[in-house]
Regions:
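Bacterial N-terminal signal peptides
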Residues: 14-22
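Acidic, polar-rich low-complexity tracts and alpha-helical solenoid repeat scaffolds
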Residues: 2-4, 21-268
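Bacterial N-terminal signal peptides that target proteins for export
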Residues: 2-14
Length: 268
């Protein structure tokens, strides 16, 4: 009797499990019922406009799954990446954009794909005290956009973003240089400040880099190089507070660059 009861219970459990499985399969099958491409795409756009980005990405992906050879599938790939970007899911956006660029290299929206990819990196830029990989990747992507599509409507803003990434990378070099200077590792500090002066000449960090370079040379007792660097600072940034500080460090002597023909960043 006990065995028979157990068999009945086991049988009921099996029936229930089978029903649950069949129900799940039915729901799954129902979720993938093919629908008109325009209906799917419009629903995805409605979700995007409602800022329901998760639902939007799901529906854009569904467009591609159900209608892979439709022109709407190509649009959906790009819009899915855009929805990921809006949701701050930058890694997913970048993956989608890389795939889009690879599959549709001649599409008219490729410049925008590069621009959006650059923005996805740009939004992840961290403080100068931390790793600057995202800054470097943003810079590389924006540079590629400008190189490949110089007349694109996105090129102008990409150039602005490039200047900002340069300033950020220069800030990182300054952060490290100041640390070395504080630790009295003067040669290491000099290399960092020279990197700013040589590679990031248009950034806001150049005046301080010249001042810190002067300071490092003075600490090493290389007075001629200190005076030469201060003269470059005074010639190019005479109203800078950093020149005032360098002027004081050098005993109040004012220095000017002798030759105006020589580029200011090539004096050493």
């Amino acid at each position: 009797m006990k065995i028979s009861g157990k068999l009945k219970i086991s049988g009921r459990i099996a029936v229930v499990a089978l029903m649950v499985l069949l129900s799940a399969c039915a729901q799954k099958k129902k979720a993938y019922v093919e629908r008109p491409v325009d209906q799917l795409y419009n629903e995805a756009m409605n979700s995007l406009q409602a800022k329901d980005y998760g639902d939007a990405t799901d529906k854009f992906d569904e467009v591609e799954r159900q209608h892979p050879y439709s022109v709407w599938a190509t649009k959906a790939q790009l819009m899915s990446a855009y929805a990921y970007y809006q949701a701050s899911r930058y890694d997913d956006a970048i993956i989608g954009l890389d795939r889009y660029i690879q599959l549709h290299p001649s599409n008219s929206d490729i410049p925008y794909a590069y621009y959006l990819k650059g923005l996805a990196y740009y939004e992840q830029i961290s403080d100068v005290a931390r790793d600057q990989l995202m800054t470097e990747l943003a810079l590389k992507t924006f540079q590629e956009l400008i190189t490949r599509f110089p007349n694109s409507q996105y090129a102008k803003d990409a150039k602005i973003k490039i200047d900002l990434t340069y300033d950020h990378l220069a800030g990182k070099e300054m952060e490290i240089g100041r640390y070395y200077l504080k630790q009295r590792q003067y040669l290491a500090a000099i290399n960092r400040f020279k990197t700013v002066i040589d590679n990031y000449q248009t950034t806001t960090h150049v005046p301080e880099a010249l001042h810190r370079l002067t300071e490092a040379y003075l600490a090493l007792g290389v007075f001629d190089e200190a005076r030469k660097t201060a003269s470059v600072l005074g010639y190019n940034f005479p109203d800078s507070e950093w020149y005032v500080d360098s002027y004081k460090m050098l005993g109040g002597k004012e220095f000017k660059r002798k030759s105006k023909k020589e580029p200011w960043y090539k004096v050493w």
